[in-house]
Amino acid sequence: MNREQWLNECIQRLRPDFEQLARPLPEKIRASCSWPSKSGLAAKKRRIGEAWSSRNSADQSHEVFISPVLKEPIEVAATLVHELVHCAVGVEEGHKGKFPRLAKALGLVGKMTATTASAELKAHLQQVTDSIGPYPHAELTHSNATKKQGCRLLKVVCECGCVVRMTRKWLDEVGPPTCGCGSPMVEEEGDGDDE
């Protein structure tokens, strides 16, 4: 079983939950492990799931994408439930109107744009995922670390308060410059990052 088969099997096992609440899922839903269309790698407000309306699909299927940063079956299934709520009530509802009513009835809690599973929903999803088997996926990570500065600039100061920045190479080769006021400038001791 691959990731997509696992996700689509999970959908089939969750269908009765939606039917019990008189909000049956559309017949044609495809789920896959893929990056959302935007903010999939964002440092803040990262999207971990996305649902697309059947109107966007050539064969009128709803498309659900689960981010590859997720690896835990319960978290994956809870995200899938959130996206399935969009499919059941209509993607155009956003996170208002019918969406919060159905989401809460299914056991999703928290801010509606970033729901988590309640204890009851987690227990239910544990049974569902145990019956399917392990989620066949390894977490995909992306570093948002800033690139290391290629050229460190050192602070050179004058007693008049003038500050310039220079590379170590130029300080070693030609020395500190003379300030516009005529006074000599000196390299400031320390890391030079305080201004």
Each model region followed by its residue ranges:
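Active-site recognition of the HExxH zinc-binding catalytic motif
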Residues: A78-V91
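Metalloprotease/metallohydrolase-associated module, dominated by Zn2+-dependent proteases
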Residues: M1-E72, V91-E195
